[in-house]
A protein has these predicted regions:
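Amphipathic alpha-helical and helix-coil boundary elements used as assembly
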Residues: 1-356
Length: 356
């Protein structure tokens, strides 16, 4: 048996937990290990170490290629993570095998590579997003989650907004933050490069993790080869001091008046534990030209404070976890009680670090 045949048998996707899918020489690579990090409103990055019997793969041929990291699940299905190869490195050779390291990123990373200075007048947020991202065709593919377009409509037109020596990514991140929008990256079979950017206004509209949805939640349980499903092994709850409300004010020099907004804490568990007076923020008139806009800004700031008042950190063996998805944790005795004792505890995955 020659080395190539032995390699194909040992590193066949049928015998491996992880595999790479792609065109050309990507098919010759077998995953040895990988790590990655992803988060809401941030660019993910996977670093994949792969081996191949071909020690002469041209690294330039891998740049910009679409690749999908396949993960075999406990039930026999597969989880997909798709991106573009940003960097390819040859780490050396060991006997008849060569090692390569691939860095995989979403298409939105391309927006970090260009700086522009331009002005938009009397434009809605979605039209500005389209104007900025259309330069990244054919890679660019995005959509809006339920409720995002209504938030954009409520935000209205911007009379004047400037991008000055910013990357397109910095500019878009600033606009989304002002409008109270976030984004996440999701798999999309209709996208030309297998993944899409999803803009959202309400995290409750984001999809549930497939393992959590199929099993009625994910158990807080041990990790063992005899278990039939993945589980969460550690979960730590961290609480922070909250405030009872937020006040916002903008000064209109022509009308000689202050435009104000105030948002109280929405959740009693936080408002009852407030330990300081309501914080006061002075904002630009362009951000709060009227009372409605000032109220919207106050509510967004209050949401940002409340979302950080109760944070969970944990670890587990659940192979489907992605940032920007929701899950329900069951059988965890130290989580806050729910009105329904049989219901699990709902969580939103903000950031996920992977190792495989």
């Amino acid at each position: 048996m020659d080395a190539a045949t032995l390699y194909q048998q040992l590193f066949s996707a049928a015998h491996r937990l992880f595999a790479l899918e792609g065109e050309g020489v990507i098919r010759e690579l077998a995953v040895e290990a990988w790590v990655g990090r992803e988060a809401i409103s941030a660019l993910f990055e996977w670093r994949i170490v792969a081996v191949s019997a071909n020690a002469d793969i041209a690294l330039d041929s891998l740049m910009g290629q679409r690749t999908t990291l396949l993960t075999t699940l406990a039930g026999g299905g597969q989880s997909r993570r798709t991106g573009l190869i940003r960097q390819a490195e040859k780490l050396g050779a060991d006997g008849s095998l060569a090692r390569y390291r691939l860095t995989v990123i979403p298409w939105l990373w391309l927006t970090t590579q260009q700086h522009h200075s331009q002005v938009f007048q009397n434009r809605t947020l979605d039209s500005i997003i389209e104007a900025v991202l259309q330069d990244y065709a054919p890679y660019a593919h995005w959509r809006y989650a339920a409720g995002a377009e209504a938030r954009i409509a409520a935000f209205g037109e911007r009379d004047h907004i400037a991008q000055f020596r910013e990357t397109d990514y910095q500019f878009l991140s600033r606009l989304l933050a002002e409008a109270g929008l976030g984004y996440t990256v999701a798999e999309d079979d209709e996208a030309p490069f297998g993944h899409a950017v999803v803009f959202f206004a309400d995290s409750a509209q984001l999809p549930e993790d497939p393992e959590s949805a199929a099993g009625g939640g994910i158990r807080y349980h041990r990790a063992h080869s005899q278990e039939s499903a993945d589980a969460i092994q550690q979960l730590i709850c961290e609480t922070r001091a909250a405030v009872g409300g937020v006040a916002v004010s903008a000064w209109d020099p022509e009308a000689k008046r202050a435009i104000r907004g105030h948002a109280p804490a929405r959740y009693g568990v936080f408002s009852g534990r407030a330990v300081s007076p309501d914080p006061y923020f002075s904002v630009s008139l362009s951000l709060a030209p009227d009372t409605t806009s000032a109220q919207r800004v106050a509510e967004q700031v209050m949401e940002a404070i409340e979302v950080r008042a109760l944070v969970f950190t944990g670890s587990g063996s659940v192979r489907t976890l992605r940032s920007g998805t929701r899950l329900t944790v069951t059988d965890c005795p130290h989580l806050p009680p729910q009105p329904d004792d049989t219901a699990g505890y709902p969580l939103l995955l903000d950031a996920v670090e992977h190792c495989g």
